[in-house]
């Protein structure tokens, strides 16, 4: 017999899809509602970064991400970002600002992120990256992606680029 405290739980059922959780996060970020990322591969991800691996400068397709650093690397793996660099909803891409970031001429924010840090982040308009990890300890990060509108998903081309498959 399985003890009731040892039952299997799924993060998608117990947290990600939970209406109460989405209402709570919506209140924090000042949105009337949040919707699941309508993408079969990108709504919940676990990122692993071994020594020397990094995630280059980019913007997210989803409006919001909740991240939890499960395991910090020995060194490196620093999360860096430039807040409100563009306004994708208004079609203002700020290519000059993007160039300044890539050329090392922008003011970069580097929050303190240690193992166990839970962070809410608006990645659609904030350019961000993770620097190369150093050491044998793998950086492990869980990402939950949400949007302020329903039905938003990665394009098929993006799914193939990131995951090598469509579903």
Predicted regions: what is each one?
Residues 83-84, 89-167:
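Catalytic core of Fe(II)/2-oxoglutarate
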Residues 13, 23-41, 45-118:
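Catalytic core of non-heme Fe(II) oxygenases with the double-stranded beta-helix
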Residues 6, 63-65, 139-141:
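Broad gene-expression machinery/nucleic-acid interaction feature
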Residues 2, 56-58, 132-134:
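Short glycine-biased active-site loop of nucleotidyltransferases that positions the nucleotide triphosphate
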Residues 6, 58, 127-128:
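Histidine-centered active-site/metal-ligand motif
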Residues 1-11:
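Single conserved hydrophobic/aromatic residue that forms the stacking wall/gate
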């Amino acid at each position: 017999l399985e003890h009731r405290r040892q039952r299997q739980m799924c993060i998608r059922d117990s947290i990600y899809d939970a209406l109460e959780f989405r209402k709570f996060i919506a209140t924090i970020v000042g949105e009337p509602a949040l919707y699941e990322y309508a993408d079969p591969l990108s709504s919940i991800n676990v990122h692993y970064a071994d020594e020397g691996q990094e995630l280059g400068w980019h913007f997210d397709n989803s409006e919001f991400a909740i991240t939890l650093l499960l395991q910090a690397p020995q060194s490196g793996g620093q999360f860096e970002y430039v807040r409100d660099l563009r306004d994708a909803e208004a079609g203002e891409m700020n290519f000059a600002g993007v160039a300044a970031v890539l050329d090392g001429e922008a003011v970069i924010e580097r929050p303190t992120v240690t193992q166990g840090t839970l962070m809410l982040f608006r990645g659609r308009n904030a350019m961000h990256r993770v620097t190369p990890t150093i050491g044998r300890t793998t950086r492990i990060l869980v990402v939950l992606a949400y949007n302020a509108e329903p039905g938003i998903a990665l394009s098929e081309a993006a799914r193939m680029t990131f995951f090598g498959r469509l579903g």
